[in-house]
């Protein structure tokens, strides 16, 4: 429950809206439960995307798309979120960014070539000329991860492997304990407050107990 509470507070602070934060949190919990990534990976990616300026309603869908690519190429999800977010804040693609995508095995140049109706070797010239904006990169990511795309549905497919199922079971257990903790939050908080009082006032409590004896 503690981990969930921290995430809930973090999203409420970032969004300034409890309802939006709760909606996003429920989406992320479900995504973690049906993909090979754990809740912490998914939540960290969500926080990064929000910090880069992604709207709350688009965060989970974007994470799923980036997660499909990350799962397909066995690269860290947050690494790809960083690269995507950096391109978004720059509002265009630079040569070094294209190289970073390509270096990770992401066929971005191929997708951009299709978009612009040019050969792959001409994409670099378009990037250098500043003609490839973030919307084009976003469209390329969507094309790669739509149903039937190169990476479409890979996270869900990987979640059916033994490793993926173990990760999903761990997330399900965390979710179960969170629900139990939420239902008993008042009791737990009172218990913790009582324990804190005992620790902070152990000398006073000790004297009282000695007097009783």
Residue ranges and their predicted role:
Residues 1-34, 41-52, 58-71, 79-150, ...:
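Small-residue helix-packing and pore-constriction motifs in hydrophobic alpha-helices
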Residues 187, 191-198, 205-208, 212-213:
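Short helical patches
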């Amino acid at each position: 429950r503690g981990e969930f509470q921290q995430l809930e507070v973090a999203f409420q602070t970032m969004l300034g809206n409890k309802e939006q934060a709760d909606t996003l949190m429920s989406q992320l919990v479900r995504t973690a439960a049906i993909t090979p990534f754990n809740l912490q990976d998914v939540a960290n990616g969500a926080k990064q995307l929000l910090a880069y300026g992604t709207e709350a309603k688009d965060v989970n869908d974007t994470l799923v798309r980036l997660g499909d690519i990350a799962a397909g190429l066995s690269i860290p999800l947050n690494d790809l979120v960083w690269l995507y977010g950096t391109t978004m804040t720059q509002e265009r693609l630079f040569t070094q960014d294209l190289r970073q995508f390509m270096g990770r095995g992401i066929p971005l140049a191929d997708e951009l070539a299709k978009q612009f109706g040019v050969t792959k070797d001409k994409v670099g010239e378009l990037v250098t000329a500043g003609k490839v904006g973030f919307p084009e990169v976003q469209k390329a990511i969507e094309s790669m991860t739509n149903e039937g795309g190169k990476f479409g549905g890979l996270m869900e497919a990987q979640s059916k492997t033994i490793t993926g199922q173990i990760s999903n079971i761990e997330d399900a257990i965390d979710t179960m304990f969170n629900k139990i903790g939420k239902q008993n939050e008042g009791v737990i908080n009172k218990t913790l407050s009582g324990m804190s009082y005992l620790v902070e006032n152990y000398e006073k409590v000790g004297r009282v107990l000695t007097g009783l004896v």
